[in-house]
Amino acid sequence: MSRVAKAPVVVPAGVDVKINGQVITIKGKNGELTRTLNDAVEVKHADNALTFGPRDGYVDGWAQAGTARALLNSMVIGVTEGFTKKLQLVGVGYRAAVKGNVVNLSLGFSHPVDHQLPAGITAECPTQTEIVLKGADKQVIGQVAADLRAYRRPEPYKGKGVRYADEVVRTKEAKKK
């Protein structure tokens, strides 16, 4: 039995929740998010809270209910507060710039790298070596950050590359003669 699913998700004032079968839509000041839940999960909205439980006849109902609770909690946080992900560029000549919804990266290649941001995600560069991604959808923010990092992952000898702000890069010792 899932302990996560037993805790209800509190719906704050200003957040609108619509349940249409297994499709849940949550609307708030930062936008609107929609998700289709597994058939094994039953969601109830009462007293400004969402409660979760398994449907009858499903073996993995509690496990799926815990997953659904975590996903919907992230959606509620996203439409109220939003999510932020910070990236750092480490290396000589590595720099970033944002023009509209395109992130322009200079990462030591013979050409600049332009990355198109999906709808609902904004980026800003406080400095030339920092990128701050903001948005309501936690999964999309994480995917965009992973895509930007994949252009030049931190290498293990000098630590050069694109890294998350809280990432610790373990460096190896150079080969000795």
Curated annotation (Swiss-Prot):
Keywords: Ribonucleoprotein, Ribosomal protein, RNA-binding, rRNA-binding. GO terms for biological process: cytoplasmic translation. GO terms for molecular function: rRNA binding; structural constituent of ribosome. It holds the Pfam family Ribosomal_L6. It comes from the Bacteria. GO terms for cellular component: cytosolic large ribosomal subunit. InterPro entries: Ribosomal_uL6-like (IPR000702), Ribosomal_uL6-like_a/b-dom_sf (IPR036789), Ribosomal_uL6_a/b-dom (IPR020040), Ribosomal_uL6_bac-type (IPR019906), Ribosomal_uL6_CS (IPR002358). PANTHER family: 60S/50S RIBOSOMAL PROTEIN L6/L9, LARGE RIBOSOMAL SUBUNIT PROTEIN UL6M. NCBIfam families: L6_bact (TIGR03654). Belongs to the universal ribosomal protein uL6 family. This protein binds to the 23S rRNA, and is important in its secondary structure. It is located near the subunit interface in the base of the L7/L12 stalk, and near the tRNA binding site of the peptidyltransferase center. Part of the 50S ribosomal subunit. This is Large ribosomal subunit protein uL6. The lineage of its organism: Bacteria, Pseudomonadati, Pseudomonadota, Gammaproteobacteria, Enterobacterales. The gene is rplF.
